Amino acid sequence: MRGACAEIPLKNFAKIFTSGRGKHFCPLNKLLASGNLKLPKTTAIFNMGPARVCPALALNLCRAFTPTGKHCCYAMKAETTRTPLVFPYRMEQQKFWKKVTAEDFVSQFILINALKELPWTKLRLNEAGDFHGQSCVDKADKIAMLLARFKVKTYCYTHRSDLDFTKVRYLVISGSNFQKEGIPNLFMMVEDVKRDRPKGFSVCPEDCRICDLCSKRGQKIVIKRH
């Protein structure tokens, strides 16, 4: 005989753990964004950290520089020219990321998503920041594996050419100006997309609401440096 709790719909169950006192069981609820100026609301966004303390930048692996040497990271602009709340918000995301397990992340994500009128179908990791180390790659791929069971695709970009991606199976990664085993996509910044686009490369329309190339495997994409 099934217990009474077995009859509780997922949406009602999710409400218990994401609102009121239950919000303490679901801290991820305040750390996920639904889309932005370019991404659709069906894409959840989570950062492993802010651009200002990006591991790739600290290791001199970031390639977001103009020919004259000026740093042109788009994520950094949000922390320096927009609301002062952006940086502390991303620091909270970093704090959460460093202690959460893949299983806990996905459990909370699914509960939050169950309450949405327009559910997320994708998770974009690292609108800002990058992998802190190898354990972040492993955790992110496990999250991607678990979310795939719920028909949510997980993808990201990285400058961390020093890390090992050979065991990545589910996370769709675009290497920023580099590609190696385990990274199926290549994403390049160029000065002029007409003049500098290599043969076989697609041009980023800079509007993810009409394009999904970066979440598909086997893509080569150029974007105008901005």
Give the location of each predicted region:
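Class I S-adenosyl-L-methionine
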Residues: M1-H226
